[in-house]
Design a protein with these regions (language model features):
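Gly/Trp-centered helix-boundary motif
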Residues: 1-107, 111, 133, 141
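Generic hydrophobic transmembrane alpha-helix motif, especially the helices
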Residues: 70, 74, 105-106, 114-115, ...
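Perimembrane helix-loop junctions in membrane proteins
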Residues: 45-52, 149, 179, 183
Length: 183
């Protein structure tokens, strides 16, 4: 247990007080619930992602919430709660892909840029500045649309969203690593 006391987020929790501690713990609990819902989606969701009937009876379309469908159903007769729970899994995959890819690519490019310098450094920084000049959400949406050519495959959707978010966040890692290398 002594090993964990020096972890940055444990120190932050121990040092925070009042409203700051409440907000920090609330955020951690929400993230924990989200991650657990994504991991245990097959156990938590009452129906599968695309299930539109149970016991041979089709679900009603656009049904209001009731005991069987806690959040109602969609136009296509799909359970909304099940789709929300399964969607958290897709979101978690996308987050993992984009964070890992951004971290590795940004660190690699930052090391190259800071170490070699010169014309390569100027080009990489100019590209990073160009990416910064666009609104990040708009850039990510446009890139995801351009990259998603699979027509509905969950893997293709996760990868296109992950790559588009990666492109938006790479310049941040690049700048931080580059500045540390150049010191």
């Amino acid at each position: 247990m002594e090993k964990f006391k020096n972890l940055p987020f444990i120190k932050q929790i121990r040092q925070s007080v009042g409203l700051q501690r409440f907000m920090l713990l609330t955020g951690l609990i929400i993230i924990l619930i989200f991650v657990l819902a994504a991991i245990f989606a097959p156990l938590l969701a009452p129906f599968s992602y695309s299930q539109s009937k149970a016991d041979g009876i089709s679900f009603a379309t656009q049904a209001t919430p009731d005991a069987k469908h806690l959040l109602g159903t969609t136009v296509g007769g799909l359970d909304v709660l099940s789709r929300v729970i399964w969607g958290s899994r897709t979101a978690l995959y996308t987050i993992l892909v984009s964070v890992v890819a951004s971290l590795f690519l940004g660190t690699f490019l930052g090391l190259i840029s800071g170490y070699f310098g010169g014309w390569l450094d100027r080009i990489l920084v100019a590209i990073a500045d160009a990416i910064y000049s666009f609104p990040s959400l708009l850039l990510a949406i446009v890139m995801a649309i351009m990259l998603n050519t699979t027509g509905g495959s969950i893997f293709g959707g996760i990868m296109s969203a992950g790559i588009s978010i990666t492109v938006v966040f790479v310049p941040q890692y690049l700048r931080v690593v580059r500045s540390e290398v150049m010191k």
